[in-house]
């Protein structure tokens, strides 16, 4: 089994990411082997598929444009005030729902900013947003089993094992690392679902069609490094260094933050937000002729449809994991 040229099936690498092949109706195709395959390489079997979610919900606290980099590779605090101009600031947080437009882009509701934005007559080289590290996905996904004899439907969770060719998110919470246990009060004291192939530990349900359990599933980004076991046991990697993104517009980085939105998180429990920074590929030049500043959200690959195998070797959908949304800043 492979998930990319020369890569082991369960290897955590860039070659193991990306979308899966779908049919004309958008259903993920299950190959004769009983597994989905890569959208570009039919010989590359996958245990997850990066797809475009139907709905993506996030709480935003701050947004700004900067004349120098707000991201730091070290230090206990972030500084996005000295060299940045805020275009959005809401201490309580504003819940934004992003709706897939069918091409990887999204519309935001409500609008992030009401009214005019006052920016300096400057050249901005960086941008940032501060958001909750609780990312929510509401998504349904169909599967095409016509090319395999291994099974006729996907297994999922709920009150008991569910089966069908359509699977959807339900109101449960998981972490990026699929940790076990219960969070502390900073994260709502919620029970975490590990996605181990049992009904109780799944954040999804399957059937012939979506039912009344269809809801937002929550994914907590608790660390940017490796973690295992129970919540709070593993140490936290609070920084994700700059790397390219599918939406373009520059390289992106992130830092986990405490509730004051300035101190770098040191534990899973005190890490409740994250700063998303962009090193702009083309600096934004704001002058007297600038009439428009826009923020675009990209959802391509922002839901990770994750699978495992049950003891009887049935393919089981464990969760629709939320990956950080892509953000593009433009001015004209």
Task: Indicate residue ranges for each PLM-predicted region.
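A short, solvent-exposed, low-complexity linear motif enriched for acidic/polar residues
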Residues: 2-8, 13-332
